[in-house]
């Protein structure tokens, strides 16, 4: 419709048509994200033993156009760990974190992103290993640091287009691998987004909320 009729419309009509196209694109992305979240809840057991650096480079390959458009600086703090994961979903989780960092850069500044290894323990003493994605964006207020991982929830004041499902998918991916996903403030400004996976796991964990 846009290609066929755009030249026949006045300025007001063309603006209205552009709004329809943008709304359709947002709806399409929303449906895609909902399907991704549903699939993540039913993902296959983590059967792949893989170097996290391979996952990160695949994510950066997929985001290459956006990285160039934003003139982003990406730093990888090697060595990154080996992970036992479902590769498809681990890539999706890391992709969403890096895409989020690209999207929420501070106004007027090129994104400055660092990807580094992270290890720790959960509350039950189980070993976790994964990645942290650091940015120099506006940060996340303390009261919003958990809610942004809920479906369709976004930080108040972040007036940037999106479906509000990306971080919910990250959390689902982490938890289905007996891990965690969370955010902390970064020293000097910005945020640190973590995605971790259980070291000793044989199948995804079903998380009850």
Role assignments for model-derived ranges:
Residues 22-27:
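Short alpha-helical segment of the dimerization/phosphotransfer core of two-component systems
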Residues 46-61, 114:
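A conserved beta-strand-to-alpha-helix junction within the catalytic ATP-binding
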Residues 65, 138-139:
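Glycine-rich G1-box
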Residues 101-105:
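Short helix-loop "hinge" at the ATP-lid/N-box region of the Bergerat-fold HATPase_c
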Residues 140-152:
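Short conserved segment of the HATPase_c
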Residues 166, 170:
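Short alpha-helical Gxxx[C/S/T] motif in the catalytic ATP-binding
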Residues 178-184:
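Glycine-rich ATP-binding loops of the HATPase_c
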């Amino acid at each position: 419709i846009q290609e066929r009729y755009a030249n026949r419309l006045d300025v007001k009509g063309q603006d209205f048509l552009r709004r329809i196209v943008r709304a359709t694109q947002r709806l399409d992305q929303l449906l895609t994200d909902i399907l991704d979240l549903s699939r993540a809840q039913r993902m296959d057991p983590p059967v792949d033993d893989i170097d996290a650096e391979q996952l990160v480079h695949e994510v950066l390959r997929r985001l290459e156009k956006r990285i160039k458009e934003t003139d982003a600086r990406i730093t990888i703090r090697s060595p990154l760990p080996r992970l036992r994961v479902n590769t498809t979903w681990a890539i999706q989780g890391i992709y969403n974190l890096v895409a989020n960092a690209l999207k929420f850069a501070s106004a007027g500044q090129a994104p400055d992103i660092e990807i580094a290894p992270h290890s720790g323990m959960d509350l039950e003493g189980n070993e976790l290993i994964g990645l942290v994605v650091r940015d120099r964006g506006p940060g996340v207020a303390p009261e919003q640091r958990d809610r942004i991982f809920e479906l369709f929830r976004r930080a108040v004041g972040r007036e940037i287009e999106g479906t509000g499902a990306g971080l919910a998918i990250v959390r689902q991916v982490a938890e289905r691998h007996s891990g965690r996903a969370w955010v902390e403030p970064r020293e000097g400004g910005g945020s640190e987004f973590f995605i971790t996976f259980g070291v000793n796991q044989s199948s995804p964990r079903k998380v009850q909320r």
